[in-house]
UniProtKB/Swiss-Prot annotation:
The gene is valS. This is Valine--tRNA ligase. InterPro entries: aa-tRNA-synth_I_CS, aa-tRNA-synth_Ia, Anticodon_Ia_Val, M/V/L/I-tRNA-synth_anticd-bd, Rossmann-like_a/b/a_fold, tRNA-bd_arm, tRNAsynth_Ia_anticodon-bd, Val-tRNA_synth_C_sf. It is found in: Cytoplasm. CDD domains: Anticodon_Ia_Val, ValRS_core.
Amino acid sequence: MVCVTDQNNETTSQNRADKLPKSWDPKAVEADLYQGWVDAGYFTADPASDKPGFSIVLPPPNVTGQLHMGHALDHTLMDALARRKRMQGFEVLWLPGMDHAGIATQTKVEEMLKETEGKTRYDYDREEFIAKVWEWKQEYGGKIGEQMRAIGDSVDWSRERFTLDDGLSRAVQTIFKKLFDAGLIYQANRLVNWSPVLETAVSDIEVIYKDVEGELVSIRYGSLNDDEPHVIVATTRVETMLGDVAVAVHPDDERYKDLVGQTLPHPFRDDLSLKVVADDYVDPEFGSGAVKITPAHDPNDYALGLRHNLDMPTIMDKTGRIADTGTQFDGLTREEARIKVREELAAQGRIVKEIRPYVHSVGHSERSGEAIEPRLSLQWFVKVEELAKMSGDAVREGDTTIHPKSLEPRYFDWVDNMHDWTISRQLWWGHRIPIWYGPNDEIICVGPDEQAPEGYVQDPDVLDTWFSSALWPFSTMGWPEKTPELEKFYPTSVLVTAYDILFFWVARMMMFGTFAAKETPELLGEGKDGRPQVPFTDLFLHGLVRDEHGRKMSKSLGNGIDPMDWVENYGADALRFTLARGANPGVDLPVGEDSAQSSRNFATKLFNATKFALMNGAVSEGLPAREELTDADRWIVDLLEQVRLDVDAYLDNYQFAKANEELYHFAWNEFCDWYLEIAKVQIPREGTSAQGENTQKVLGHVLDALLRLLHPAMPFVTEVLWQALTDRTSIVVASWPTAADTNGGVAVDADAARRIGDVEKLVTEVRRFRADQGVKPSQKVPARLDFVACDLQDLEDSVRSLVRIEQPEDDFAASASLEIRLSQATITVELDTSGTVDVAAERKRLEKDLANAQKELETTAKKLGNEAFLSKAPDAVVDKIRGRAQIAQEEVERINKRLEELA
């Protein structure tokens, strides 16, 4: 081993190796490294900089929450982009923040008050309760920030925002008034998702669907005499018949042709009658071909009711109890009424058939757990037609590019078919709707710098959380004021998010972003060709993180993974690299403990390789002259340049998985497994040599660039190793590798690449042959082969070292041989393994291996022969089992062949 002497107290490679710990322990360094980056101001953006701007806004996590695996993926990819752009010389603003999460936060605080004080929010006035929420936010709202630091987010903490900050509240009031004045906000009675427990409308994303065992009940409307007008309808919600106003049939259904236009009496309500209407919505082949219509409590019925101008009586109050029907059922809960109404109908002889159990999908409140009630309610809405068109045009015209392009149709499907958006919520926590009502039923919208007239009362509702989130890209930079941040960093460069909130958040940001730009181009800039400016020029949509079997992570399955557990057990780099290495655009990502362990092992491999290189004199001082390099030297620096080109192309197109997979393969399979092993031969054990010094420079040169390329995905381990290698301040502010940092931009040496390729094949085949012969890996054996014939004479020492073979003596007698086809010739390798193999022990070992291989073959064959497994298991799992079966079959054949040879 060569150690550079420490003359004149200069820092040497050995000194730097000594600074590294004995082994890689991420927990010992990550927190201090991160705080050092923050303290140094590396993440703080300067709007006055003359560097080109690059900006990302963090999709704001709920203040109530903790980071889950989806967040971890989001943050890893955004951080990788931010770190790379910073290294490329951009002025980077990655702006963090949190969402006030109206329903989630209010629910959390109400639960806390019930547990600690035995009170509900109604025991306080509105201002007192909101003060309680702010207290809770101050005490518990910092959890996510701590977790973001733990995974290494390079965000600008000096610009952290909260959706209820004063500046953002001003933006909300401003956009609301502009939309209202433009006639794009209105109030109406519409069907909404209603939570009887929370007593508010909720958004679609806050509704989760569960399979529920119910009963399908067939009811007879009209006469009980078969010869007189009647119809039979089926429902799982018998109680809603209290609000039935019609029965619908298909226009072409001959069975009901004479009934269309007639009315049937309601079994319980004299104030309602059931009109028989014809509508194409009805499937005449399903059931009886007749459908009961409850316009105020079913989305499809509501749409049909609008088409036929039907009455829409609401039969439930805000708590979900039957109300205002004038029947004996008033005051009952939905569940109680379901039983009582069925009993009364049965008593009248109107229950024709019951199917129990009947499994059907029912929407439930994500926050409170009860079944959602579709309910006609007076709410505020955004008229989306004009806004949605601008959003669609922005993508169609290329102002915003969606990655991957394959998800464009999904985006267009949403924006082209969007319904008006319910924006009011019956909560106390959130942005209060800036509508005021006068004493004579006047309605005015009050802007941020205006006061309502005396005697006016503000609307009690708050805005949907997504309303303020839709302003996030520009409200966080100071809009509606003119700010240096907007001038430098708007529009944002890219939005990174999962495809599942494409409608809920992304489309709405596009709507409000283009509208705000149209209204205030002097603040947000002009778009292309007279179109409004967009909030982001690129939209990268990644998939969802799933478990290792491809299943959605859920509490019911118990398969969720806490990313903080991985940080604790494997380190932040392992978490990040696992996610980055699996992040293909728009494709779901399965992960498991094996993935994290593999990434941790990779970090350890990098650490050990760098420490070994430093102990062997690696220096980052630039490359020697090209002609002074060996084949192996030229091959590795040329390969590094190809990897750099590929990684740049991949990352420019958000192909994170391909970029990191290529870096992994290069680092582990090419640099560590091959070049480091050859370098051991090229660096003399004692003394120095020109070739050895050149190899030390190549080692340092390649590691320097490799660590910088890996830094966006693995910031912590690369920082520690790069500082040790280069003795410089921080890799965070190092430059991103260019051709000058790889092979100097010269033409690739194809001959060197060919010869190293031959070495890899030769060594691999000889190693495999040795193993088949039962020769221990450490055992040297004499061997004869013609290095000149295969043009590998300059690499003979490396080959002999790598495969543990010695020069043959004069009396050499081969006991085994193999032929290997290389690029220039087929070479025969003759080996003398006599005396190196214990035949009895080798047979015993092989028989044990054979038993294991046969057991694996039997296990996989059993699974692949199971039709239930094949039909239910994800394709990736089945393919993995098939791969295992093939490997086991090949192993059985190989071992049997070797046993025959021993016999």
